[in-house]
Swiss-Prot record:
Residues 150-187 are annotated as: Disordered. Homodimerizes, then multimerizes. Interacts with cytosol exposed regions of viral L glycoprotein present in the reticulum-to-Golgi compartment. Interacts with human FLNB. Phosphorylated form interacts with host importin alpha; this interaction depends on the exposure of the NLS, which itself depends upon genome maturation and/or phosphorylation of the capsid protein. Interacts with host NUP153. It comes from Woodchuck hepatitis B virus (isolate 2). This is Capsid protein. Sequence repeats lie at residues 159-165, 166-173, 174-181. It holds the Pfam family Hepatitis_core.
Length: 187
């Protein structure tokens, strides 16, 4: 069974696989970023968003993998076998966790739509033959104007918005019609 964990977010595992392996930060940096930006939302009891849930799940998976590696390291006597297993875990499962954390952190930071646009534009760029593509790859480093990053989650108090009065409108939205004079009125 081929399950795509990004399907519900409008993306795909295949699309993320076009990004080079060294594109994704190391796990410690991603965990530090998640903790610094969203610790309250990740440890709180309330459900914030599917992205928060996915980050929680990725962190739980990585924690379990770390425990497995520690157990294998202490129980496997052959240094060569231990190195092969640790490298395999880091190159396969570790990469999947890095991809997942990067994707969901980016969606929370930049907005899901912006991340999807970036992925599509990067795939188009990388699949275009070098002589025909621009020299620089698309980057996900600037915040679009419509993205707002809120600190403190949904529980933060917000000041009420002031509304500017709208211009007065005519009662009827249809165009005004002039009364045409009847031919008998001209007589």
């Amino acid at each position: 069974m081929d399950i795509d964990p990004y399907k519900e977010f409008g993306s795909s595992y295949q699309l993320l696989n076009f990004l080079p392996l060294d594109f994704f930060p190391d796990l410690n940096a991603l965990v530090d970023t998640a903790t610094a930006l969203y610790e309250e939302e990740l440890t709180g009891r309330e459900h914030c968003s599917p992205h928060h849930t996915a980050i929680r799940q990725a962190l739980v998976c990585w924690d379990e993998l770390t425990k497995l590696i520690a157990w294998m390291s202490s129980n496997i006597t052959s240094e060569q076998v231990r190195t092969i297993i640790v490298n395999h875990v880091n190159d396969t499962w570790g990469l999947k966790v890095r991809q997942s954390l990067w994707f969901h952190l980016s969606c929370l930071t930049f907005g899901q739509h912006t991340v999807q646009e970036f992925l599509v534009s990067f795939v188009v760029w990388i699949r275009t033959p070098a002589p025909y593509r621009p020299p620089n790859a698309p980057i996900l480093s600037t915040l679009p104007e419509h993205t707002v990053i809120r600190r403190g989650g949904a529980r933060a108090s917000r000041s009420p918005r002031r509304r500017t009065p709208s211009p007065r409108r005519r009662r009827s939205q249809s165009p005004r019609r002039r009364r045409s004079q009847s031919p008998s009125a001209n007589c």
